[in-house]
Amino acid sequence: MTAMQDTTAKPEPRTFSERLARMVGRGPTHLILGLIALVWLVPSIGLLVTSFRPSADMRSTGWWTVLFEPRFTTANYERVLASEGIGEAFLNSLFITIPSTILPLLIASMAAFALAWVRFPFRDTIFLVIVAMLMVPVQVGFIPTVTGFRESGTGLLTNYGAVWLTHTAWALPFGIFLLRNFFITLPKDLIEAARIDGASNVGIFRTIVLPLSVPAIAAYGIFQFLWVWNDLLMSLIYAQRNAIQPMTVKVTQLLGTYATEWSLLSAAAFLIMIVPLIVFISLQRFFVQGLLAGSVK
């Protein structure tokens, strides 16, 4: 006779002593995680505090002295917002980031569905090539793409087109990899039942796959939004007209104007952080769920 394993779940602790024992047992883990979070947050906290400090205080003392002598001002933000082109640069960041997020989402989700559920020749080979493209550095494409855009005569380097296309192209391999790995975890019986009922691939993608894949799609969208919003290098190369340059480029230009005014530069840097912080905090649940689901087969 074979022994049966006890698979019953352990009951939750009910008494105070049991809860206290569990908390003490988890104490080292919580302590380590708390220290990691503190180290991660200290630079951002310092940046925020510095952005509200008077310039004279910033030059004479460290930002942590506000714990004993709190003195704050909004003058730094007022001067930065009054700088020429800041408002336009903020709008440019939105005009660059939103299309550069939506385009990869649309293309990557459709391509990932095809690679996961549509049978066609060399499907696995194509997926391996796409995965291999993840290892290609972005910098290797700068010269050929800039040359191609310039010689095309379309003026893409003087409008948003070049930035949109390059961000989309470099985002697709990761997006296809992430979403395809999530799509193949969907119930096969559900997909096959829809096909038996006469649903087309487009119908299956629209009515079944997309509603079930909201966490993965949202995670990829958040990741792409944050990446494009914080990008400096590609904006410097592909947004070659001052009128279309985003906030990241504008802040680097402020270094020449306020080279030693670190409180002003801190205010400008924190203005860039506001939108990504709002997006991530609002949608972080989808971000974590999507990454965990798409990281394994």
Q: Residues of each region from the PLM?
A:
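A structural signal for multi-pass alpha-helical bundles of membrane permease subunits
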Residues: 26-297
